[in-house]
Amino acid sequence: MSLPATFDLTTEDAQLLLAANTHLGARNVQVHQEPYVFKTRPDGVNVVDVGKTWEKLVLAARIIAAIPNPEDIVAISSRTFGQRAVLKFSAHTGATPIAGRFTPGSFTNYITRSFKEPRLIIVTDPRSDAQAIKEASYVNIPVIALTDLDSPSEYVDVAIPCNNRGKHSIGLIWYLLAREVLRLRGALVDRTQPWSVMPDLYFYRNPEEIEQQVAEETAGAATEEEEAKEEVTEEQTEATEWAEETTEAVAW
């Protein structure tokens, strides 16, 4: 698929894709994913062609931007590494997020509280989000999916080939997808204009690591306060001693 020059993959974006290990696919290859294989490494890992990843990502962004009401788009991730990315994507583009377990019947059973009638769904993994894809097929909802080389592609209309198991890879794909959607909508004036949002915002963060970081920062702040108090106490002691010496000298 040939893209207009404005949609060409830039060197910076290619470096981001490689740094996030987006190009590292599975050892097994599903028959429909064979066109996306760039080569196979000696250790058996198949390498994804990032050029084709970018082409599919731009195609998906153009489909998303063509829907007038952003709330008619549902972004789904039952995979833990993709839940933060889905929430951030929805916050920036106006889509409806489903982060965590997908409630069966959300697209087919109008009695349930979680019932939705989207015009498009985007899933992080066709395997973990299989229930959402299956229900979408019942009611003719188009599906965009982040697919690894061994992912099933049944009922998937647009597959974005990438590493959909790594937390950095998942976060980066959702980040780039959100950025391209905003550019197509005109929220970002020009493709040369950098987006103020960093890719790190879309990356999964372990709650235990966050708590540990906060505890370390709190402990560091407490230590600094104690050191400052000790310095003040020492200065006061020196001032008192100097005053006593001065008083004795005057009295003498």
Swiss-Prot record:
Q: Which residues carry this modification: N-acetylserine?
A: 2
The cellular location(s) given in this protein's UniProt record come to: Cytoplasm
Gene Ontology CC annotation, any one: cytosolic small ribosomal subunit
Q: Which cysteines are joined by disulfide bonds?
A: none
- Where is this protein primarily located? cytoplasm
Q: Which Pfam families match?
A: Ribosomal_S2
Q: Which domain of life is it from?
A: Eukaryota
Q: From start to end residue, where is composition biased (Low complexity)?
A: 213-222
Cite the PROSITE patterns for this sequence: RIBOSOMAL_S2_1, RIBOSOMAL_S2_2
The GO molecular function terms of this record are:
structural constituent of ribosome
Q: Which GO terms describe its biological process?
A: ribosomal small subunit assembly; translation
PANTHER family on file: 40S RIBOSOMAL PROTEIN SA
What is the protein's known function? Required for the assembly and/or stability of the 40S ribosomal subunit. Required for the processing of the 20S rRNA-precursor to mature 18S rRNA in a late step of the maturation of 40S ribosomal subunits.
The record's family statement is: Belongs to the universal ribosomal protein uS2 family.
Q: What is this protein called?
A: Small ribosomal subunit protein uS2
Show the taxonomic lineage: Eukaryota, Fungi, Dikarya, Ascomycota, Saccharomycotina
Q: Name the gene.
A: RPS0
